[in-house]
Amino acid sequence: MISKFKFSPAVKYSSDILTIIKNFNTSGQLFGNGDRNVIKLFDIEGSKINIKAFKIPNLINKVAYRYFRKSKARRSFEYATILLEKGIGTPQPIAFLEHFNIVGLRDSYYVSEHLVTDLTYRELVEIPDYPDHDKILRQFTRFSFELHQKGIEFLDHSPGNTLIKKKEDGNYEFFLVDLNRMEFHETMTFEMRMKNLCRLTPLKEMVAVMSNEYAKLYTESEEKTFETLWKYTADFQEKFYRKKRLKKKLKFWKH
């Protein structure tokens, strides 16, 4: 078996992390439901770290990740480094590790600091009277605008992938997680920007607030911003529920 790994330059406890990953299945505190990827928390040198073990890839991807594409763990590490260089919040990247066997990629891990935050965007969708709801939503929209201005297309810009933390001055800061699908551009068109926001909420009133705030920062009118964002949102919701119904039917026919 071949192992490849890389640590952030500031990390002083690299051998401890390699030992933790070696014993990953039998140690650590499970974080989340572990449906697709398994995330565990570990205490090390007085800090809490977060290790994500990516789902073992199928045969085609095993080969692809060895010869043609970077693994999700490596992309997460590299994209986190780029985000921080561009002044965008994300938990501090610590390391990635890949194990390869004769076929291809066997398994891979991404290690980062574990951030304790107050909420994710999902709470804004599910709890309409969440304290500071309007303020957080507007500040989140400004954060998304900053991403777009810097040419960052976060392809998994969905409700659970932005952590939100209240600062001492009463404002909010935002941190992106689940980073392995990202593209970087010189500039982003209006259509690209709106499409990038369409997976966040199905609620028309939230889309209206976001459109109002985004239009203050961009060259398009509020009316055009809302019209375009709502169109992409409705399209996404329709596809999402169509796929859900299809899965339900397939499940029914299997039984």
Task: Tell me what each language-model feature is.
Residues 171-253:
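C-lobe/activation-segment region of protein kinase-like
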Residues 139-164, 205, 216, 222-228, ...:
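Charged, low-complexity C-terminal accessory regions
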Residues 1-29, 247:
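Juxta-kinase regulatory segment immediately upstream of eukaryotic protein kinase catalytic domains
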Residues 60-66, 122-126, 186-191:
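Short acidic, glycine/proline-rich loop/turn micro-motifs
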Residues 39-42, 50, 142-183:
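Active-site acidic catalytic loop and adjacent metal/ATP-binding pocket
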Residues 73, 82-89, 122-155, 159:
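Conserved kinase catalytic-core helix
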